[in-house]
C-alpha cells in the first residue's frame, strides 16, 4: 500500500491485449465509495445515476443483440417487470425450456440485464427472462427475492423444473443463491441448474480478497456495499446469507470468478459451503481477469467464459 493507494501489480502474462485495454482505465479510476453511496440515497441523483447507466449500455447492448442474433422485448410476469431475450428464428418448441437471469449492479442499478442474457440466449437457443426486480434503497431485502420467486413460480406453472435454469452475476449471483434457499424453504421443486458468477453467499463477513484486490468500489467490502439492501435483516439470517443455512438439496451449480475479482474469496467460500452440503458444483477461476469480465465481449477470455456458461445450461436444462 502506498500513500496514493493500493499498488497495482503488473498484468498476468496470459491476459489478452483486449482485456488489458479494458482493465487499464478501471485501475486508474479514483473510487469514491462514500460519495457513490450518498448519490444512491438521494432520489434525484439516484434516478440520474440509473439513467446514465442505461444510456451507457444501450448502444453496447444493441451491438450485442446483433452479434448474437437475438430479439429483446419487455413485459411482465406475475406483476414483475421482465425482459425477454430469445434467439431469432426460434419457435414455440424453444419455450419448453427457460433460463431466468438476475442482473448485477449492487442491488441499486441495472448493470447487466442484457449484457448477461443476450450472449447466453444466442449461444444456447434457450429463451432467457431477466427479472427487473425491485432495488435498494427504495426496496430492501427480501423484495428482490420476492420478485424472483414470483417469476420462478410462474415458470413452474408452464414447464417442469427440469426445464428451468437460473443464474446471475455479482448482485445477481447473490440473488440466485438467496432464491434457491427460499425455494427450499417454500417446499418448491428446485430448478435443473443454477449459475453463481462472481457473487457472495455471506453478507455478514468480508472475504480475504476484498482487503487487497483493486475494485471500483474502493475499500468497501461486499457487506458494506450492500448495506442499504440488508437494512432490517440480521446479516447471518440464512435467507440473506445462505452460507449460514442448510444448503443440501440445491441443484448442480456452476461457479465462476477470476483472480483479480474482488469477490474471488466470496465465490470460493460459497463453493466450499456448497461442497460441504454435497451439492454438485463446478468452480471456474480465470487467471488475471477482473470482476465479471465476461460482460466485455471484446475480450477473448470472455468467449471462453460464455462458452462454459452456455455449455453448462445446455447439459443440465432439458425440455
Protein language model regions, located:
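Alpha/beta-hydrolase superfamily serine-hydrolase fold, recognizing
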Residues: 22, 26-30, 35, 39, ...
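A glycine/proline-hinged amphipathic helix-loop "lid/cap" segment
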Residues: 1-90, 319
